[in-house]
């Protein structure tokens, strides 16, 4: 009934915000043997997962009804990477970081495998974390990877 109410009563006060707790509750950040890569144990791209799980800021922490449905709803979410990747028919580059503390290897592989394009490439940046904090050499390697891929296809000169 709430979505119907929102459709009828549009305007600045139609949406009501709320906080979603526990959005970093992923056992992979505590146990590096689950979906293993080179990431640091007991760590996520936002810090200690036991702390950031209920911190004031986080992954989709503040929501409205519509944004929650888009991000978290099992049936209605538009945030399904592999399903969206099936619609990619143009050349695609997927860059994975081997110490990624935000996207594990299964994420990278599912996206890459789902891409429909016959021209798809997956490249790994050894030892790189999610945001490359304190890793200027890894960031440079990622930029060089993208630059080279674009130049190979004459997308960039």
Task: Identify the role of each PLM range.
Residues 1-83, 90:
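Alpha/beta-hydrolase
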Residues 77, 101-107:
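Conserved alpha/beta-hydrolase "acid-adjacent" motif
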Residues 82, 105-109, 140:
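Short, surface-exposed alpha-helical segments at coil->helix boundaries
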Residues 85-88, 114-117:
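Short, conserved loop/helix-junction motifs that constitute active-site signature segments
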Residues 88, 94-96, 100:
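Short beta-strand/loop motif that positions the catalytic acidic residue
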Residues 92, 120:
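Hydrophobic anchor at the start of a short beta-strand
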Residues 122-124:
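Conserved beta-strand scaffold positions in the cores of enzyme catalytic domains, especially
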Residues 126-157:
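Catalytic active-site module of serine/aspartate enzymes centered on a nucleophile-bearing elbow/loop
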């Amino acid at each position: 009934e709430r979505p119907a109410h929102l459709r009828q009563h549009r305007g600045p006060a139609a949406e009501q915000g709320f906080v979603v707790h526990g959005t970093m509750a992923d056992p992979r950040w505590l146990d590096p043997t689950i979906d293993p890569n080179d990431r640091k144990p007991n760590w996520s791209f936002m810090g200690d997962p036991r702390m950031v799980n209920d911190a004031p800021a986080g992954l989709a922490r503040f929501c409205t009804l519509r944004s929650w449905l888009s991000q978290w709803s099992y049936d209605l979410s538009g945030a399904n990477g592999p399903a969206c990747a099936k619609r990619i028919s143009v050349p695609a580059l997927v860059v994975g970081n081997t110490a990624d503390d935000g996207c594990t290897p299964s994420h990278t592989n599912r996206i890459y495998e789902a891409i429909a394009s016959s021209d798809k490439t997956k490249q790994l940046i050894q030892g790189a974390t999610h945001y490359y904090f304190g890793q200027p050499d890894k960031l440079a390697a990622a930029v060089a990877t993208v630059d080279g891929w674009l130049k190979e296809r004459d997308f960039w000169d």
